[in-house]
């Protein structure tokens, strides 16, 4: 069935599945099939921030004084994060919105994707401040072999889903040849592609940022590149929310409470999902090798980062019902939690940009029952 921006068929959105039902018509939020997505939207909106709010002028001085191997670590991570958020700033909208059937999930995907564009703008804000010619950095992203190796794994799941869902929308089920490749398109094969695409996105949000995050926070622990670390802290807070969103979608699918066929597909794809996560973890270990090829930094080295990748991979895989692949069970860099959990840090508002400040998070609804325990 071809995608329509406004279906005129009246339907009960509470009875629609998350995906592959009737396209959303009225964007209504007085009722939700899954209230979690509404809460995620509200939380993301309360997080709203702009990179220009953070003063990164001291970072230019700090960066100039770094030894060459630490400059390599810092700038390489920014390149890699730019790649990840370039993909995430457009792909969820392009791939998922034509398939969504409930308004709260549709709006969550749009809200999520918009926040990713802020992340991309942040990297430009940081890079523009520390180097004289930012284009040298950005131009290297699409030619850097280490970065491109990761880009293919990340983008292929999106690309396959987008291609086949467009074929399905235009022509229905069948076998088609696109760019010399034979594509067998069925509704079930699309559901499988969707599940694996979401699992790939989950791995991206769950693992792929965290080597870079750890390095940024390790610099800040030494009172270096602190403006960058404040921005990365905002980004990490957003990414944790996006991770919660994909975990929730995947767990609903696996439980079969939304679409019984998705539960079958989740079971059928368990090994592929496991392999996908482990491959992402191994790539991040290889990224740590690349970062530290010329030397370590104070408080962080290749071996510590490898242990951290294994630790965090176990946690993320357990959250979506997958077996644990690694022996590492304890966090080798516990100090990172002070950066990843915004409530852990108390600061004076006049001294720094306050990353724990939220907007519109007071519940102003009052019911007569709220006064039942009052006595005069």
Curated annotation (Swiss-Prot):
* Transmembrane intervals: none
Biological process (GO) annotations held by this record are: deoxyribonucleotide biosynthetic process
What EC designation does it have?
Answer: 1.17.4.1
Alphabetically ordered keywords of this record: Deoxyribonucleotide synthesis, Iron, Metal-binding, Oxidoreductase
Residues annotated as the enzyme's active site: 123
Q: Name one Pfam family in it.
A: Ribonuc_red_sm
* NCBIfam families xrefs: PRK09101.1
This chain belongs to the protein called Ribonucleoside-diphosphate reductase subunit beta
